[in-house]
Amino acid sequence: MNFFLSSRWSVRLALIIIALLALIALTSQWWLPYDPQAIDLPSRLLSPDAQHWLGTDHLGRDIFSRLMAATRVSLGSVMACLLLVLTLGLVIGGSAGLIGGRVDQATMRVADMFMTFPTSILSFFMVGVLGTGLTNVIIAIALSHWAWYARMVRSLVISLRQREFVLASRLSGAGHVRVFVDHLAGAVIPSLLVLATLDIGHMMLHVAGMSFLGLGVTAPTAEWGVMINDARQYIWTQPLQMFWPGLALFISVMAFNLVGDALRDHLDPHLVTEHAH
């Protein structure tokens, strides 16, 4: 609440947008006016009216219903990416920082190799190796981002592992896992969440881009990238078909980026998060 009240108006608006997106993603399946996958050819390419607030697409599907349903798919995909990449970052980075030695050296050499390439290129490469489909796209995006999270966790753990409370815990017989959970996780997670919030926008663009190219979510499932791809051939005659999912993606990415920047300034102003996407 203090963060909300002390933030700029733009950040407050972004937080409201994110809350609204989360609400739509969680509840839209119960109040959509139309089935987002229902084909109605006699109603194809209709302009916005009282029955179809945003019009219909080339198959007569209600664009508003598809846009709301796509929110759930897009946000759900990104949350799955974040959960996986945070887990990898905590486990790999925490292990490297606490164990040290050859484990640390080997882990960081692998991380450096991953960090050499832009995450977008790595994501496409991973999809080429794993195959198409939403699950593989989620895994690919997580694998292209884990090194940044692992390196951050490792740096924070190294800076804390010689503190008196950590040494006392080790002397009492606590293992690496116990030391990390009891004493280090609380110091690591805030910085990790800042980086995660800053990365949500990039991940949303990656998921939408993969789906646009037919590598992730595929038709008839409603997803913003799929909707933009479906609307390509009608861009000159029915530009609103592409405008609505593009606007939803733009607003979502901007909202998460604004909140991420504000969180970084609020929690960790010295956090370095510049990495190649």
Swiss-Prot record:
Single GO term (MF) = dipeptide transmembrane transporter activity
Q: How does it sit in the membrane?
A: Multi-pass membrane protein
What's in the keyword line of the UniProt record?
Cell inner membrane, Cell membrane, Ion transport, Membrane, Nickel, Nickel transport, Transmembrane, Transmembrane helix, Transport
Entry's PROSITE patterns? ABC_TM1
Biological process (GO) annotations held by this record are:
nickel cation import across plasma membrane
Q: Which GO terms describe its cellular component?
A: ATP-binding cassette (ABC) transporter complex, substrate-binding subunit-containing; membrane; plasma membrane
Q: Where is the ABC transmembrane type-1 domain?
A: 67-260
Q: Where in the cell is it found?
A: Cell inner membrane
This protein's major location comes to membrane
Q: Which residues lie on this side of the membrane: Cytoplasmic?
A: 1-12, 100-120, 205-207, 261-277
The lineage's top-level taxon is Bacteria
Q: Write out the transmembrane intervals.
A: 13-33, 79-99, 121-141, 184-204, 208-228, 240-260
Q: Please list the residue ranges that the record places on the Periplasmic side of the membrane.
A: 34-78, 142-183, 229-239
Q: Which family does it belong to?
A: Belongs to the binding-protein-dependent transport system permease family. OppBC subfamily.
Q: Whom does it interact with, and what assembly results?
A: Probably forms a heterodimeric pore with NikB.
What role does it play? Involved in a nickel transport system, probably translocates nickel through the bacterial inner membrane.
Task: Report the protein name in the record.
Answer: Nickel transport system permease protein NikC
Query: Which gene is the coding source of this polypeptide chain?
Result: nikC
